UniProtKB/Swiss-Prot annotation:
<dbReference type="Pfam" id="PF13520">
    <property type="entry name" value="AA_permease_2"/>
</dbReference>
<keyword id="KW-0813">Transport</keyword>
<dbReference type="InterPro" id="IPR002293">
    <property type="entry name" value="AA/rel_permease1"/>
</dbReference>
<dbReference type="InterPro" id="IPR004754">
    <property type="entry name" value="Amino_acid_antiprt"/>
</dbReference>
<keyword id="KW-0029">Amino-acid transport</keyword>
<keyword id="KW-0812">Transmembrane</keyword>
<dbReference type="InterPro" id="IPR050367">
    <property type="entry name" value="APC_superfamily"/>
</dbReference>
<feature type="transmembrane region" description="Helical">
    <location>
        <begin position="209"/>
        <end position="228"/>
    </location>
</feature>
<keyword id="KW-0050">Antiport</keyword>
<comment type="function">
    <text>Catalyzes the exchange of L-arginine for agmatine. The arginine uptake by the bacterium in the macrophage may be a virulence factor against the host innate immune response.</text>
</comment>
<keyword id="KW-0997">Cell inner membrane</keyword>
<feature type="transmembrane region" description="Helical">
    <location>
        <begin position="241"/>
        <end position="263"/>
    </location>
</feature>
<dbReference type="GO" id="GO:0006865">
    <property type="term" value="P:amino acid transport"/>
</dbReference>
<keyword id="KW-0843">Virulence</keyword>
<dbReference type="GO" id="GO:0015297">
    <property type="term" value="F:antiporter activity"/>
</dbReference>
<protein>
    <recommendedName>
        <fullName>Arginine/agmatine antiporter</fullName>
    </recommendedName>
</protein>
<feature type="transmembrane region" description="Helical">
    <location>
        <begin position="11"/>
        <end position="33"/>
    </location>
</feature>
Length: 483
């Protein structure tokens, strides 16, 4: 009997992958959920918003799980799903956009980390764009670069420790707010329709809270992105569902329990991070310190996860010939060294730019949040396409009809997310994605794949993207749309 030798890069189990999914989703924003949700919605609307978002994002999570089962040969998920389903240019565009999203997102974590640190050392890091903040943020960029260079296994171990340290203060917050929970307070004006309140209809409350909930699940694709590092393909789907379920439960409890100890109008006035403000009211100063410490750990942990994923997509794309082949270079620890250094270098440049304009940076963060959404759409559409093809395995554990329904509902919810992200941000994304066209063309020529990369279909797709970018530039320059 022959034993299949496991690749030295395939070293992540279900626990490590789940840790990456959780840390990728749970960033600093979770510590502001109580106020963010209560600012424009009642307890009833918040509960309904999480229910609807949970159902929608479940189909995206299940899309990734299904694809990991029926197509375990496709590594680095969102990139390879897009390429396999819709050609090399769409695959490149998804990889390019996702990479930019990670770079800007990581620098966003640097800014948030420095701002969180300012609680302990005011005023040196206020706003996250002071000189001390830029220097320390830059140092952390290269520290995380070094950690990941030591190997994905070691980085994921550090990540698991960070996840545990993040969850401890969140669980303490849940226990404390549960201890002070009073149903008489919770049920007061449950739907926010009392005359003295200005929350509006349930529909308007839902709309405002859904905009908060939709960003809470960005990162659910974490296990899929590094599926090439998984010890067992089945672990990818398990980690995705476990991470989704765990985060949803935490989000719901963190958002709803405070409504049982404080009234909606009180929660709406608490400064961010509002979990710290809530505990300061309930148990005193130590609760505030605890949550601010948790915020700092959460952001650093997410930053590490995003560093791992930011280097993985260009690495996978380079191995398939879509990105320049230098991005596929590994070190002796099987870490994507060139991709890491290039990613960290671009993060460093962006970090320096933050010093000159923090307001423009906030807008860029919103745009890059939208940039990941097309990857959800193309992955879901690929599942629909594959489930309808003759290539779908007849003996698959998941029936083709179930896979098709999952992909279809995931596609519809992805379209809703893109719409909710805002038309102005979508146009800006078109400009950023179009910037990758020269690199795609160059890669096709260098790899002598003109017939595949530059055939009529791919040229048509590039033309549509270029025209969308030109339209966006015109609309912005004519002040027809604004960021």
């Amino acid at each position: 009997m022959l034993l299949k030798k496991r690749s030295p890069t395939s070293i992540l189990g279900t626990l490590a992958l789940t840790g990456i999914v959780i840390s990728y989703m749970i960033g600093g924003g979770i510590f502001s959920l109580p106020q963010n949700m209560a600012a424009s919605a009642s307890a009833g609307a918040v509960m309904l918003a999480w229910m609807l978002s949970g159902i929608g994002i479940f189909f995206i999570a299940n899309t990734f799980k299904t694809l990991s089962i029926i197509r375990p040969d496709l590594k680095a998920g969102i990139y390879t799903y897009s390429r396999e389903g819709f050609g090399p240019y769409v695959g490149f565009t998804i990889a390019w956009g996702y990479w930019l999203c990670q770079i800007f997102g990581n620098v966003g974590y640097a800014v948030i980390t420095m701002d969180a640190l300012n609680y302990f050392f005011p005023p040196y890091f206020a706003g996250g764009n002071t000189i001390p903040a830029i220097l320390l943020g830059s140092l952390l960029i290269w520290i995380f670069n070094y950690i990941v260079l030591r190997g994905i296994r070691q980085a994921s171990f550090v990540n698991i420790i960070g996840v545990v340290c993040t969850l401890i203060p969140l669980l303490l917050f849940i226990l404390i707010t549960a201890r002070f929970f009073k149903f008489s307070i919770f049920k007061t004006d449950f739907w926010g329709t009392a005359p003295q309140h200005t929350l509006g209809s349930i529909g308007s409350q839902l709309k405002s809270t859904m905009l908060v909930t939709l960003w809470a699940f960005i990162g659910i694709e974490g296990a899929v992105v590094i599926s090439g590092r998984a010890a067992n393909p089945s672990s990818v789907g398990k980690a995705t569902i476990l991470g989704f379920s765990g985060c949803l439960l935490i989000y719901v409890l963190l958002s709803l329990l405070p409504f049982g100890s404080l009234f909606q109008y009180q929660l709406a006035k608490i400064a961010d991070p509002s979990t710290a403000g809530v505990l300061n009211i309930l148990v005193g100063k130590w609760g505030e310190v605890l949550m601010n410490t948790g915020l700092l750990i959460a952001v650093l942990t997410s930053w590490l996860s995003w560093t791992i994923l930011a280097s993985e997509i260009p690495y996978a794309a380079a191995k398939n010939g879509t990105f320049p082949e230098c991005f596929a270079i590994e070190n002796s620890k099987h870490a994507p060294s060139f991709s890491l250094f290039m990613t960290s270098g671009l993060m460093q440049i962006t970090m320096l730019l933050v010093y000159f304009s923090s307001n423009a940076w906030n807008t860029m963060l919103e745009i890059t949040g939208v940039m990941v959404l097309p990857a959800y759409l193309t992955s879901s559409l690929f599942l629909v396409k594959f489930s309808l093809s003759k290539k779908y395995p007849k003996q698959a554990a998941i029936k083709a009809r179930i896979a098709m329904i999952t992909g279809l509902l995931g596609s519809l919810y992805s379209l809703w997310l893109i719409y909710a992200g805002g038309l102005q941000h979508l146009f800006m994304v078109a400009i950023l994605l179009a910037l990758g066209i020269p690199f795609y063309v160059d890669s096709g020529i260098r790899h002598k794949q003109e017939k595949t990369f530059l055939n009529r279909k791919e040229i048509l797709k590039m033309t549509i993207m270029a025209l969308a970018a030109l339209l966006a530039i015109f609309l912005f320059s004519a002040n027809k749309i604004h960021l």
